[in-house]
UniProtKB/Swiss-Prot annotation:
Pfam families: Mur_ligase, Mur_ligase_C, Mur_ligase_M
Listed InterPro entries: Mur-like_cat_sf, Mur_ligase_C, Mur_ligase_C_dom_sf, Mur_ligase_cen, Mur_ligase_N, MurCDEF_pg_biosynth, UDP-N-AcMur_Ala_ligase_MurC
GO biological process entries: cell division; cell wall organization; peptidoglycan biosynthetic process; regulation of cell shape
Keywords from the named record: ATP-binding, Cell cycle, Cell division, Cell shape, Cell wall biogenesis/degradation, Cytoplasm, Ligase, Nucleotide-binding, Peptidoglycan synthesis
Enzyme category, top tier: ligase
Gene that this sequence comes from: murC
Pathway: Cell wall biogenesis; peptidoglycan biosynthesis
Ligand binding (ATP): G111, T112, H113, G114, K115, T116, T117
Catalytic activity: UDP-N-acetyl-alpha-D-muramate + L-alanine + ATP = UDP-N-acetyl-alpha-D-muramoyl-L-alanine + ADP + phosphate + H(+)
Domain of life: Bacteria
Name listed for the protein in its UniProt record: UDP-N-acetylmuramate--L-alanine ligase
């Protein structure tokens, strides 16, 4: 495990970075960090005793540190990173530090979609069972009050990110892989075949005798799983899903008032009913992956069944902001076409509801590579608003790639008009004029589009309070004769 007097994190407000910073702090290491903007995560770190610098990066921020941690988003000319290298300090990529946690008794959740929800489920299963795991997530989880927690138990639960090849540093005891699709192609030479090979290599790195829990509904994972099974003694492969080859199956998936319910079948034997307080067929698959991992860790099905019944998902995963006057306001991190389809389908499951969607595309490169898939991802949206493309610093626009171009492609496919609105206040005005009782309004994207959901929820609640007050003041006073 890392030995250091003080560790400094550049970009400490990121989900993965804040998780690592919190765990080190809770384990007694002196920690500092910097970020250009304050957030709930930087505030939590400061309250925990982390020395947090907000604003422009400055070499002075690394004073006293003997280890400096950075992420892929940090450019080489960052003054703190440059100073650390110049001073000969130990400099670690985020994934190198995470690898020190994941190369022991660990459960790593990988996949193009569903990592945060699935790893959150695994974390909750082990936490509620009293195993006190160390937890490192890519989203805020209510049960631990953030993204990271240093446990006293042997198990570590974490996300294994494929986006920048980070997961190739890890050697977990258990790997849960949800799916494999084209995404983050800029890190994989634009090749889906290279992404597939990356997942193949990651699974080969599971500790000997460990477990690979793979979603059988994904053809790439079925193929890789069969390859691994043909290499006896390397890793134990278990398939889960709805596919006939799955040992752990979700059957009879159906909605219930709070989310979804399904029959959990293992090796042809009914274990029982699993009820999730979150909607979506994809979440049935996510929970199955978590059940397989929990079973490996020694948990009983009954224990896991009870924990999932009260599961509170990570923030920005079908997060309900308000339900006012029959209008439900939801926010979701969905930013890939497959995630968008699954999220809109989950919203559509609520019978009789019109779906009003607001999508913030992220990255010109993603929009360019997946334009055809995005064009067909919004069939379940009755009303659709697109914002400008949300792009990280340093990414250059690509000619012909814009929200307007995407809107034209979607409109040609659905036959329904698509509004393109850049300003969030203007989006709010549009929604307030458009929505009606019975609607589900859902904001989607990896950027700051959640602020629209928050603003809409506040506006609807304020409108309801004002209307109630007005109707109350209009009642006749006792004895007025009206």
């Amino acid at each position: 495990m890392l030995k250091a007097r003080k560790v400094h994190f550049i970009g400490v407000g990121g989900y993965g970075m804040s998780a690592l910073a919190m765990v080190l702090k809770q384990r007694g290491t002196a920690v500092s960090g910097s970020d250009v903007a304050a957030s709930a995560r930087t505030q939590r770190l400061a309250e925990a005793g982390v020395e947090v610098h907000i604003g422009a990066h400055d070499a002075a921020h690394i004073e006293g540190a003997d280890v400096v941690v950075y992420s892929t988003q940090v450019p080489e000319d960052n003054p703190e990173l440059a100073a650390a290298r110049a001073r000969g300090l130990r400099v670690l990529h985020r994934s190198e530090l995470l690898a020190e946690f994941l190369n022991g008794r660990s459960i790593a959740v990988a996949g193009t979609h569903g990592k945060t929800t699935t790893s959150s489920m695994v974390a909750c299963l082990l936490e509620k069972a009293g195993l006190d795991p160390t937890i490192l997530l890519g989203g805020d989880l209510e049960v631990i009050g953030g993204t990271g927690k240093a446990g006293r138990g042997d198990w570590v639960v974490a996300e294994a990110d494929e986006s920048d090849r980070s997961f190739l540093r890890y050697h977990p005891r258990v790997a849960v892989v949800t799916n494999v699709e084209p995404e983050h192609l800029e890190f994989w030479e634009g090749s889906f075949a290279r992404i597939q090979e990356g997942f193949r290599q990651f699974l080969r790195q599971v500790q000997p005798g460990g477990l690979a829990a793979l979603c059988a509904d994904d053809p790439t994972l079925r193929s890789i799983g069969q390859e691994l099974r043909n290499q006896p003694g390397v890793v134990h492969v278990v398939f889960y899903g709805t596919h006939p080859e799955a040992e752990w199956r979700a059957e009879n998936i159906r909605p219930w008032e709070k989310g979804i319910v399904y029959d959990c079948v293992r090796d042809g034997r009914l274990l029982g009913e699993v009820r999730l307080p979150i909607p979506g067929r994809h979440n049935a698959l996510n929970s199955l992956g978590a059940l397989v991992a929990g079973d490996y860790a020694g948990l009983s099905f009954r224990q896991m069944q009870e924990t999932l019944l009260s599961f509170g998902n990570a923030r920005r995963r079908f997060e309900v902001w308000a339900d006012v006057d029959g209008i439900r306001v939801v926010d979701d991190y969905a930013h890939h076409p497959t995630e968008i389809r699954a999220t809109l389908a989950a919203a559509r499951e609520q019978a009789g509801r019109r779906v009003v969607a607001v999508f913030q595309p992220q990255r010109y490169s993603r929009t360019h590579w997946l334009m055809d898939e995005f064009a067909t991802a919004f069939q379940d949206a009755d009303v659709l608003v697109l914002t400008r493309i949300y792009s990280p610093p340093g990414e250059r626009p690509i000619p012909g790639v814009s929200a307007e171009a995407l809107a034209r492609r979607i409109q040609a496919n659905t036959g329904r008009p698509v509004a393109v609105i850049s300003d969030q206040e203007e989006i709010l005005r549009f929604l307030l004029a458009e929505v009606r009782p019975g609607d589900t309004v859902i904001t989607m994207g990896a950027g700051d589009i959640w602020k629209v959901a928050r603003a809409l929820a506040q506006a609807l609640q304020s409108r309801a309070v004002t209307r109630t007050a007005s109707s109350g003041s209009g009642r006749p006073a006792p004895g007025s004769g009206r």
